[in-house]
């Protein structure tokens, strides 16, 4: 959520920055609501002061032996007027907050202006895509050859966009997540966490999934006797529970940065993606991901974004997977991000790069919703922290990249050297 003072005092400047990301801010409506808020605020404060003054007069009149009934009736009337004024003000403030919750973050100045993914800017490339001297098989064909990917079974169990993994393919999927966690915890300084896969609505508001993206979530539906369960949804990413661990907390600045990682399944309805990537593991309703989250001082967040992106890149480099790094344009960034890097891995069967990691600086956008603050050791003042999140990496898409980039002419899949310790020294699948 943006700073209310910024919306209140600099609406035109905010509107100009939001226009860069294709969002039209209704400045006239905001101004009208703000003027109304000022009037109601003054009226409420005046009624409160008048009621306090009259209440004090009751005690004085009583001490003088005067009839206090007229004053008491007047105080009661003022109390009713005050309650009505407070209710009207609260309703208006709720309307303003509801509007604020739908406004995306401001883009950082260095983010390229653009409309969609076609305007993203490539920053760098690593590795050279392999040249094959045989016909390339895609990961679905390879998975079926080794009885490792069973989409038909998943359709029977659940429906489309799910998979059953088996045998050595399932083992490699597990090995990838373990390798990523070990790398981030042992070399990159993250602490490993195990988090709930169901979270409440306060948690989803904190990281910005609600109210705007309710349709992208899988919500629980209560049985009649279990009404309390209606307040849950499955996590779309471990960013949600990890970041909310600092909700309503005040952290000493010398405890920052806080760097957390977790391996979880992620659940997304993929609303709006009908017909896209219907074959294989690229776009699933349920997929695994190793997530990175950092909680930092405001002045450190841009450097932390570079560091975090480097941590995701290291996974790809150690796996020997060619990739490119791009900076998202204003029109393609996520709702809460001020700056985002995407890493796209080479997928041979598609002859293109596909997103495998997204690393974002969110500034204080989530922290304001969560009321997550840090305290200076010198003057004890508090301020909002900055939060960052990144994929390190999406496990299923990494599996796709490994299967396709490491395939052999006879259909076998070479196991990358860094994964062999997790697979009992296995060199090839098949």
From Swiss-Prot:
Residues that, per the record, bind ATP: 268-270, 355-358
Subcellular location: Cytoplasm
Cystine bridges: none
GO terms classed as biological process: selenocysteine biosynthetic process; seryl-tRNA aminoacylation
GO molecular function annotation: ATP binding; serine-tRNA ligase activity
Reaction(s) this enzyme catalyzes, per UniProt: tRNA(Ser) + L-serine + ATP = L-seryl-tRNA(Ser) + AMP + diphosphate + H(+); tRNA(Sec) + L-serine + ATP = L-seryl-tRNA(Sec) + AMP + diphosphate + H(+)
Pfam families named in the record: Seryl_tRNA_N, tRNA-synt_2b
Pathway annotation from the record: Aminoacyl-tRNA biosynthesis; selenocysteinyl-tRNA(Sec) biosynthesis; L-seryl-tRNA(Sec) from L-serine and tRNA(Sec): step 1/1
Domain notes: Consists of two distinct domains, a catalytic core and a N-terminal extension that is involved in tRNA binding.
Role noted for this protein: Catalyzes the attachment of serine to tRNA(Ser). Is also able to aminoacylate tRNA(Sec) with serine, to form the misacylated tRNA L-seryl-tRNA(Sec), which will be further converted into selenocysteinyl-tRNA(Sec).
Record protein name field: Serine--tRNA ligase
Protein source organism: Salmonella typhimurium (strain LT2 / SGSC1412 / ATCC 700720)
């Amino acid at each position: 959520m943006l700073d209310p003072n910024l919306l209140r005092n600099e609406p035109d400047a905010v509107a100009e920055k939001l226009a860069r990301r294709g969002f039209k801010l209704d400045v006239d409506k905001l101004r009208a609501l703000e003027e109304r808020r000022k009037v109601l605020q003054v009226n409420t404060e005046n009624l409160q002061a008048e009621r306090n003054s009259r209440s004090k007069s009751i005690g004085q009149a009583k001490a003088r032996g005067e009839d206090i009934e007229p004053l008491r009736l007047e105080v009661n009337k003022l109390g009713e007027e005050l309650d009505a004024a407070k209710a009207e003000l609260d309703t208006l403030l709720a309307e303003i907050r509801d509007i604020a919750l739908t406004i995306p973050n401001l883009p950082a100045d260095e983010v390229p202006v653009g409309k969609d993914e076609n305007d993203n800017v490539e920053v760098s490339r690593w590795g050279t895509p392999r040249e094959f001297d045989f016909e390339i098989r895609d990961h679905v064909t390879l998975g079926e050859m080794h009885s490792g990917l069973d989409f038909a079974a998943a359709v029977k169990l659940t429906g489309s966009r799910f998979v059953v993994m088996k045998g050595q393919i399932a083992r490699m999927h597990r090995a990838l997540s373990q390798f990523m966690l070990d790398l981030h915890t042992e070399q990159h300084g993250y602490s490993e966490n195990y988090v709930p896969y169901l979270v409440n609505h306060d948690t989803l508001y904190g990281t910005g999934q609600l109210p705007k993206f309710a349709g992208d979530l899988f919500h629980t539906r209560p049985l009649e006797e279990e009404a309390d369960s209606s307040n849950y949804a499955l996590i779309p990413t471990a960013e949600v529970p990890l970041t909310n661990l600092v909700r309503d907390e005040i952290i000493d600045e010398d405890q920052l940065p806080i760097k957390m990682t977790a391996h979880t399944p992620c659940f997304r309805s993929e609303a709006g993606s009908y017909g896209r990537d219907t074959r294989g593991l690229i776009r699933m309703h349920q997929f695994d991901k190793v997530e990175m989250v950092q909680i930092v001082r405001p002045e450190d967040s841009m450097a932390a974004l570079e560091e975090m992106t480097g941590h995701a890149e290291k996974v790809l480099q150690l796996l020997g997977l060619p990739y490119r790094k791009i900076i998202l344009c204003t029109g393609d960034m996520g709702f809460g991000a001020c700056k985002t890097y995407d890493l796209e891995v080479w997928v041979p069967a598609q002859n293109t790069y596909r997103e495998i990691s997204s690393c974002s600086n969110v500034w204080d956008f989530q922290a304001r919703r969560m009321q997550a603050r840090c305290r200076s050791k010198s003057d004890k003042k508090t301020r909002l922290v900055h939060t960052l999140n990144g994929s390190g990496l999406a496990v299923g898409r990494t599996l796709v990249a490994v299967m396709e980039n490491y395939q052999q002419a006879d259909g076998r899949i070479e196991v990358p050297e860094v994964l062999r310790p997790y697979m009992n020294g296995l060199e090839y699948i098949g």
